[in-house]
Amino acid sequence: MVFSSQTFLFFFLPLAGLCVFVRSKPLQNALLLMASLLFYAWGEPKMVALMALVTLVAYLSGFAMVHFEERPGAKKVVLVAAIFVIIGNLFVFKYLNFLCRTLSFLGLEDPHLALPIGISFYSFQVLSYVIDLYRGRIGLQRNFFYLLMYVSFFPQLIAGPIVRYETVEKEIRTRNVTMDDLTTGFRRFVVGLAKKLLLANQVAQVATIVYAGDPKYYGSLMYWLAAIAYTLQIYFDFSGYSDMAIGLGRMFGFHFLENFNYPYISFSVTEFWRRWHISLSTWFRDYVYIPLGGNRVSRGKWIRNILIVWGLTGLWHGADWNFLAWGLSYGLILLVEKLWLGKYLERLPKPLRWLLCMMVVCVGWVMFNLTDFTQMRFALVRMFNFTHVPLVRSLAADVSIVPPLLWMVPALIFSTPISQGIRLGDSWWAEVVRNMACLALFAICILFSVSASFNPFIYFRF
């Protein structure tokens, strides 16, 4: 079920929203759990049991670690076993197909296992629970259904943000939903919905048309526009989902951490990754990079740590060579930036630093988007070989590209924090204006959703 679908907006959300008015927290949690499992079962009925099984592994491992609190060795064995099972499950369903295809020369056949939606996200949440419990950062959750609600809670289940248990530990047991939570959460949800329907979906066709079209009609300019369009599409698609998840969570009394902070205003690749998919970046930092030694090791080991983290980051996004290449490329760029290039970049004017950073990001998204290496190589070469094709000829090749190109203008504007400059204050009339604007935007989104074809979020694939 997609947040932007008619089914979700007019059937599921109103019914699930009734949970807010249930005063008993145990009953409210039970209803939210049932709603979340229904939400997941809507598209993946067979995979609900798999998610519950992974949660059960974490639940039982938690009790075992508490039992062995005075025996560190046994406690660590339990942790390692739990991690092995959780990652093993992720590997089988996400990477086994890829491994068998890669090693097909050994006679291995592709098992064609279906990828459970959201498995990368909920696996990382379960891992954070068992690791943080081992570290003593959180308390044991003795109620299996509460733990399952944390893992399966429908706002963030499919595409994040990756919510750590410590963020919602208290709110699972005790939370109060105020009118401010409902209005603020709904407004945030509508902003995310608008990002998806009014911006991401509209600019998406630029890259689709160019990459699927005859190259003789598209020169370097159009290939750059395609790269920029996909850069905008993936930002508004993914940050839109995060906004909707954060807004929905707020409406039910949960406060999720931010996942994006205007990444396209960054002046360096390092800054970009502090602003993009924050929940994933900090997850790898806290559970992989720092345990490997972080930057408090020799230079050689530090370089190793960076490459391991970014190789895993690439593979987390997808089981294909282009994702691994994308992740390792960013690892190498960050190494060059930290070891040498950074001090020179700081001497450049800010507009030039921003332009260079965005060029790197756009190239990165081309690698991310195109899984076929031949097509990827052609697109990257065409971007930099100054092939000239008159713009009129490119537009005439497929005139349906014109509206998406025009939609790129507002998308570029709203990828910056320009809206943050609008300050209405806290008076009653300002609140009325905000709510009226929100309802108007919601109505526009509904009109777009009625005519839109099925267009799932990009990160549903991961």
Label each PLM-derived region with a short phrase.
Residues 1-461:
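Membrane-embedded transmembrane alpha-helical bundles that form the catalytic cores
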